[in-house]
Amino acid sequence: MQWTADKVQEEVVKLLQPFNPKGIEITPDTDLSADLMMDSVAAMNLVMEIEDRFEIDVPISLLPDVNSMRDLVDVVLAQLSKG
């Protein structure tokens, strides 16, 4: 499958639902920590879900730079492009 930013975002939004108990609308500008109250454990669980869904590895070293949904989609796209 050819992944576009929109398709990746759509899939990540689905994966985020268990971490979004308040049902906040997730946009590219959604702050994962402030808006969704994700802690480091939740973030690692999400990363594992993303790795399984997209069949990629997300280096832990990239996570401190991921604040928004847009950042997360960019990381996924970058890892997908590495094949």
Describe the role of every protein-language-model region.
Residues Q2-M38, D52-R53, D57-G83:
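Phosphopantetheine-dependent thiolation modules in NRPS/PKS and related acyl-activating systems
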Residues A42:
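Two-component histidine kinase catalytic core, primarily the HATPase_c
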Residues L46:
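Residues within the DNA-recognition helix of helix-turn-helix
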